[in-house]
Amino acid sequence: MTSMIPTARYRPVVRIGNWFEDICLEQEKVQAFKSLRDRGQLLVEKTRRLFDNFHKAIELEAPKENVYFGAIVQLMPMKMNICEEHVKAQPALSVIINERVVRHSQNINDECEITIAPSVTPCVRNSFRIVSGDEKDRTNEVIKYGQQFRLECVESQDDMLLLYSAPKSADLKSMIYTTFDSRKWGEINLPLGLCRKSNCGPGKEIPSAYTKWFCTHIEPKKRFESHGSPVPSNTALVITHVPTNKNLAAENVVVQTLFGPEFLVSVQNYKDIYNRERWQNIWMICNGQSEGKR
């Protein structure tokens, strides 16, 4: 029975043609690979360049008692109340880039997202410069409780990249695109993003108020009397978003990024039964000291 089944038979010239076509396709792949390599467009080279740009070492402000405008600092949650083990690398607010963006950009840009990542050493992705919130040059002035400020990426040159958040629209959607999101009681929290200063202001895409923040005392009973006093560095405090009146929050949500597992961050209020902020809303502004006042 098997001998009666017809089998495909090709003439030698047809087989040679097929082999030649396969060889041409392989040569075309090799030429495309060499062309991408010569232009530095290989994904492995882009990834290597990305890590070099994001992990470029940054020198923080010299340790001082208070926080000053113009200083390069890190924003660190006082405690990630997740496990009892002591973690050597203190987590810090950081910038990440997703797989979609890395193919056309390997630098910090307005398409990057914000997370909380382990900070072994200060670098470009986890350090920010504190600038005035009223368009005035207040460099070397002490920041006070209740005074508005902005957080600028240290790699910003001509067009500053500012940290911002935005309230939801009428359909409860956010204007900030993020790969992951966190929720409180089923509702999506407000995410953080980066925007260029040229896109902020009257008639622009993003109102300038969305980029403004201020600090308050960790104790609710002391906020009235501490308003207007200098903000101490490396000390527990609450960072509040001006237009939404919600606090910067470290979320107990782990996601996988190009840099490894990291925690999400949002703008949301977390309070206990005594109306005091929980660990998610407690931060410190680190200006170079290895350990904060705990």
Identify the meaning behind each predicted range:
Residues 1-294:
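Lectin-like carbohydrate-binding module/patch detector with strong preference for beta-trefoil
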